[in-house]
Amino acid sequence: MSSQRLRIAIQKKGRLSKECQELFKRCGMKFNISGERLVVHSENMPIDLLLVRDDDIPSLIMDGVVDLGVIGENELEEVRLERKALGEPSSFTTLRRLDFGGCRLSIAIDKDEVYNGPQDLAGKRIATTYPQLLKSFMDEQGIPFSTCILNGSVEVAPRAGLADAIADLVSTGATLEANGLKEAEVIFRSKATLIQREGEFDADKAALINKLLTRMQGCIQAKESKYIMLHAPTDKLDAIKDLLPGAEDPTVLPLSRDGAKVAVHLVSTENLFWETMEQLKALGASSILVLPIEKMME
């Protein structure tokens, strides 16, 4: 890998990896990931993707091995706390939180157990893959406990007699329910985030990073927005504009053959619900279209 190329570490496998690859493709990056390759070169930008384990990404950033990384905040904070405790470098810069990879680290207990608050965890043995995050939360609460560190299948620890409770990642809660557990306390909320190593970048790399950030912003904003078009009676235009959600002042254009109506175009940052569309129609609006946006730049 040339030091002149921007090096970005991403997760090798899993949902976070797929969503990250999709984001980069929407940003205009061309690459082909196949087989067991650990380094993938972009075909149209001076960028190399490193495909690694998710828990290696924070250290690669903190040690200055790569320039950027996409990582879940839970893994990032776990490694940061661990390295800080060991006196190792733990600095990085967060460039932006992304719109995928959402989850939460929660303490779960037996489904039949009554839970009145964190104080009920005093003296418990808690199984987890995230001992640093768990310790940070419990220390803040001033609650004594012991840790059972596991690298997988944490949810079976209570049934196996290894622990009284667990601290594990939760998305829907279905896995907890299947193992006779219930969520008791959320201790950390996480999303994917783009981070950068400390230190200076040359002008070309800095410009490329800024370009990527601008494109990411456009992709994420486009994903959250809709393009709305409709025909509106001129005498009801103000009332119709009041109904349109999360929008700047719309573009209003005359129709070629109908002087009583105008065309209204706008970008909305909120969903247009069926109820709103029905209200628009009741005011005389017609030809109402709600379209996805692929890219946008302000």
UniProtKB/Swiss-Prot annotation:
Disulfide bonds: none annotated. The keyword Isomerase does not apply. Pathway: Amino-acid biosynthesis; L-histidine biosynthesis; L-histidine from 5-phospho-alpha-D-ribose 1-diphosphate: step 1/9. InterPro entries: ATP-PRT_HisG_long (IPR020621), ATP_PRibTrfase_cat (IPR013820), ATP_PRibTrfase_CS (IPR018198), ATP_PRibTrfase_HisG (IPR001348), HisG_C (IPR013115), N-reg_PII-like_a/b (IPR011322), N-reg_PII/ATP_PRibTrfase_C (IPR015867). It comes from the Bacteria. The keyword Electron transport does not apply. GO terms for molecular function: ATP binding; ATP phosphoribosyltransferase activity; magnesium ion binding. Its main location: cytoplasm. It catalyses: 1-(5-phospho-beta-D-ribosyl)-ATP + diphosphate = 5-phospho-alpha-D-ribose 1-diphosphate + ATP. One of its GO terms (cellular component) is cytoplasm. One of its GO terms (biological process) is L-histidine biosynthetic process. Keywords: Amino-acid biosynthesis, ATP-binding, Cytoplasm, Glycosyltransferase, Histidine biosynthesis, Magnesium, Metal-binding, Nucleotide-binding, Transferase. It is an enzyme of class 2 (transferase). Pfam families: HisG (PF01634), HisG_C (PF08029). Its EC number is 2.4.2.17. Its cofactor is Mg(2+). SUPFAM superfamilies: GlnB-like (SSF54913), Periplasmic binding protein-like II (SSF53850). It is found in: Cytoplasm. Feedback inhibited by histidine. Catalyzes the condensation of ATP and 5-phosphoribose 1-diphosphate to form N'-(5'-phosphoribosyl)-ATP (PR-ATP). Has a crucial role in the pathway because the rate of histidine biosynthesis seems to be controlled primarily by regulation of HisG enzymatic activity. NCBIfam families: hisG, HisG_C-term. Belongs to the ATP phosphoribosyltransferase family. Long subfamily. This is ATP phosphoribosyltransferase. It comes from Aliivibrio fischeri (strain MJ11) (Vibrio fischeri).
